[in-house]
Structures are given as structure tokens and as C-alpha cells.
């Protein structure tokens, strides 16, 4: 896995707290708004982004009304994500502004609009994985990492 930038400290439910687990953060739930741990738990994460747990810290768990009672301290990063792009943009090592391609095939939605990336994100192309077809056209499937502003 390609990792750029520093790990982010956050809290996740005990059942999810395993290295390698990926999740999408959708924003704080109602109980988070008044929780004393919200700053470290949800305050470090960006809604709509994908995160991957690198390490579970060996600290005691904390109580939480959402995660079946307990959360653990973990280190997370934004992982690389696969996305289909226009072939002319597919140059390994280049940084592009992400522009999603329309694809009418619902089974390929995750390749053309993957969760964790937004239209207009700056991304670095890590690897070119191959071709993917949709609507009679061929696109390049690439692995990208988001570049933070």
C-alpha cells in the first residue's frame, strides 16, 4: 500500500479496530456533538473520505454510545484508491485534477466514482492498472493518492 503524509489519530469501534480495515467517514452522528472525545474522534476526519487503519494503539478503550460501548485509539491514513480516467491523463507519477467520467453501467460505478474521492480533487497517479470499458469507450484504471492542499 502506498502511504503519503502522516497518520491521523482517531477513534473507531472496538470491532473495527484492526490493521488493514478500511472505512468511509460520513460525518458525526448526533451523540458526537456533545461528546468530550469528539475532537480526537471525529474532529480529525473529513466527511466522505476513505481511511485505512495502520495501527491500533495499545491504550485502554473508551466508552462510546455508538460503537456498542467501546472505541479504541487508532492511526489511520487515506489509502490509494482505484478510479477510471481518460487515457490521455494516465501517466504514472503525474498529478491531475480529478474529473469523473460518466458510465451508465451500475456494476462499474465504484470504478468511475469511487467513495473517498471527490470531483476536483488533486490526485497523484501511483500505478496504471489496465483498461476498463464503458459506453463503448475505453478508459484507464489507475491507482491514485489524494494530494492534500
UniProtKB/Swiss-Prot annotation:
It holds the Pfam family UPF0179. Signal peptide: none annotated. Belongs to the UPF0179 family. NCBIfam families: PRK01177.1. This is UPF0179 protein TON_1048.
Amino acid at each position: 500500500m502506498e502511504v503519503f503524509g502522516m497518520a491521523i489519530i482517531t477513534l473507531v469501534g472496538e470491532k473495527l479496530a484492526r490493521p488493514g480495515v478500511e472505512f468511509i467517514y460520513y460525518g458525526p452522528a448526533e451523540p458526537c456533538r456533545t461528546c468530550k472525545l469528539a475532537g480526537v474522534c471525529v474532529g480529525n476526519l473529513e466527511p466522505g473520505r476513505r481511511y485505512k487503519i495502520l495501527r491500533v494503539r495499545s491504550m485502554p478503550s473508551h466508552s462510546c454510545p455508538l460503537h456498542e460501548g467501546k472505541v479504541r485509539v487508532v492511526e489511520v491514513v487515506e489509502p490509494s484508491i482505484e478510479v477510471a480516467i481518460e487515457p490521455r491523463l494516465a501517466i504514472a507519477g503525474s498529478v491531475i485534477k480529478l474529473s469523473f467520467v460518466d458510465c451508465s453501467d451500475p456494476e462499474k460505478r465504484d470504478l468511475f466514482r469511487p467513495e473517498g474521492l471527490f470531483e476536483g480533487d488533486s490526485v497523484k497517479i501511483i500505478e496504471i492498472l489496465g483498461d476498463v470499458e464503458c459506453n463503448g469507450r475505453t478508459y484507464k484504471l489507475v491507482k491514485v493518492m489524494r494530494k492534500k492542499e
